[in-house]
């Protein structure tokens, strides 16, 4: 069993007010009615919290506990002397009350959940200025600095349905490193995630390190799309588009010019495009290489302009007609 200070999550130097605040928080957290899905475990924790509060809230019991431990209260071990127990004898032991009795005595007949607001000083003025949240379903959250560290908490209750969820986040700075601890309490199960400088280091379930849960959480975070800081958009790297080789482009241009030249010859000779002027050109030794020597500006010159430049003169037309 953990020490009473660890159960209430307070230091050994905690004041009586700190003990009360810690019990109020833990008692509401582990109340069996708030943990119907894990009632057996919640009852155990609820009992430990009540026992720790009953001892640490009593000055005399706390002194004996600090000196002898729990054995000094139950009669096990050496135990306190007669003077320390008020002359009750060496066999004297303290009798712990039921956790339900401690809970009723602490909260009284009022709404126990309304007491949770007392833990958050930032809400004290709000409670006096407006109506309190007393409905069956309500949620609230807080965020406040604690010395040089930071912490935030959020709680949600549904008393009728027995649903309870709390999330608390605390950040501390140790030797220049930022340690963030996130505690999630839901249906009697406590999940603790510890991050160091933004990197998840451990995940614990009900106080037990869980490597499987750690691996699943790391995998889930890695699958999330990366977002450019300050931009809010996904980072996309441009991909280079492949272009056709230059010689392929020049061959296409040569082919277009050759076709234009053949058409111009046909029009000049008064023939239809279906004629075989192209074949006659090759028979008269008209080399195709002539077209490649042309200084063509790619797509910046029109095909018709080139065809006009290449149209034969009247003398050439007459000689060709004579040959035909």
Swiss-Prot record:
Positions carrying N-acetylalanine: 2
Biological-process GO terms, alphabetical: chaperone-mediated protein folding; negative regulation of cell growth; negative regulation of cell population proliferation; negative regulation of inclusion body assembly; positive regulation of ATP-dependent activity; proteasome-mediated ubiquitin-dependent protein catabolic process; protein refolding; regulation of chaperone-mediated protein folding
Ranges for region Disordered: 70-91, 218-324
GO molecular function, one term: polyubiquitin modification-dependent protein binding
Residues annotated with Cysteine methyl ester modification: 321
Span(s) of short sequence motif CAAX motif: 321-324
PROSITE patterns: DNAJ_1, DNAJ_2, UIM
Cellular component terms per the entry's GO annotation: cytoplasm; cytosol; endoplasmic reticulum membrane; nuclear membrane; nucleus
Regions of compositional bias (Basic and acidic residues) in chain numbering: 314-324
Modified residues annotated as Phosphoserine in this record: 311
Self-association and partners: Interacts with HSP70 (HSPA1A or HSPA1B). Interacts with HSPA8/Hsc70. Interacts with PSMA3 and most probably with the whole proteasomal complex.
Protein name: DnaJ homolog subfamily B member 2
UniProt source species: Mus musculus (Mouse)
Lineage per the UniProt record: Eukaryota, Metazoa, Chordata, Craniata, Vertebrata
